[in-house]
């Protein structure tokens, strides 16, 4: 069901069976004394799992609501400071940051996380610089099986720990009724946030022996993938400079060229029509202009897909005009119109998200915006 193809071939007996209800102890930390105590205990540990809870997924805009820690499987702590209208008291953000900063910055080669690049980006904005990351369970899973389709915490917990984690919807609601995490009651938030850190630590303890048994993969994650997390994190935060004035000028030029192509298409067809309508294209191509039918759709209708247009463009002018119209419209809607709207008001730059654990080949991908898909220059 989870489509973990290679993993399914493993001996089922090797999968750790844990009851649906984990043996766990999750605590809310809302006093300086308690915070000092867990920091002291965590500092003595060889591995510290961390997780941040925020108001959103945009690492340049989301507000930090709380931080969870786990240094022993089954034991985790949630330190909230940004929840709204709570009867249970919280520590002030300034106090939490002042104590976590020296603790986390000194914990070199100890800190692990699940997609820890996001946590690193968030914490950097709050003045905490995490370097020398020990590991990332998402990347451990990816290195073990790059062909698996999911490396998120819920999927890994289900597969490796036989445990179904709480989902964001469980605590924040669904659809239009869903709230941001700062509005989630602290009782629910504590179990959810602490569980994330606890499960991350449990996964690390499960995946580490598997990687240790395969030396090339262990070397890959230690020497390339984990160091790359910090490089990509820095790249994301630095952002990419865009000249919105040039983009606006290009958008205006594209709009003019698109309108000229539309007029040209109308003239060739002998009537105005919707260039994006498959039905109208079919009528004009095959009923009015009698173009030859190259192939048909599963429904038996003459096809007007991209390959058909390219072949018809070798014989007729209208398909050639339509292909150029589509190319320019794509450039305008995807790039010259959209990119300026993705420029951060805080930095004046575009901040993409790079993904290490997506492609089976190991290459990077990016999103919001996809800066690896900018088209090459055309004539």
Feature-to-residue mapping (PLM):
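Helix-loop-beta element that forms the nucleotide-linked donor phosphate-binding surface
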Residues: 126-130
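Long, compositionally biased intrinsically disordered terminal regions
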Residues: 139-143
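Acidic beta-strand-to-loop metal/phosphate-binding motif
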Residues: 49, 108-116
